[in-house]
Amino acid sequence: MTSPVAVIARFMPRPDARSALRALLDAMITPTRAEDGCRSYDLYESADGGELVLFERYRSRIALDEHRGSPHYLNYRAQVGELLTRPVAVTVLAPLDEASA
C-alpha cells in the first residue's frame, strides 16, 4: 500500500508582485484539483498577510511526482522565482496518524 503525502509550500512575495503571485497560484488550483492523485489543494494567507501558503494532499508520492511533471506545474515553476523575495519553502510530510491516511 502506498502512503499519502502532504505538502506545505510557503511563498513570500515581492511587494510589487503580490497580485501576480496570487494570480499564478490561483491558476494552479483547478487543474491540480482535477489530477487523479490530488486529495486537496488549498491556498491560504498567513494571519499577518505576509505569506501565501499552499496546503496540498496527494494519494501517494507517485501522485506528487506526477503533479510536479504536469504542464501547469512546469509553467508555474518557470514564473514563480521572479515574484518572490526568497525561494519557496517546501515541506513534504508523511502521516503518522493512519486515520488521516
From Swiss-Prot:
Its EC number is 1.-.-.-. InterPro entries: ABM_dom, AI-2_Isomerase_LsrG, Dimeric_a/b-barrel. It holds the Pfam family ABM. It comes from the Bacteria. It is an enzyme of class 1 (oxidoreductase). Residues 5-93 form the ABM domain. The keyword Oxidoreductase applies. Disulfide bonds: none annotated. GO terms for molecular function: catalytic activity; monooxygenase activity. Keywords: Monooxygenase, Oxidoreductase. The keyword Oxidoreductase applies. Putative monooygenase that might be involved in antibiotic biosynthesis, or may act as reactive oxygen species scavenger that could help in evading host defenses. Homodimer. This is Putative monooxygenase Rv0793. It comes from Mycobacterium tuberculosis (strain ATCC 25618 / H37Rv).
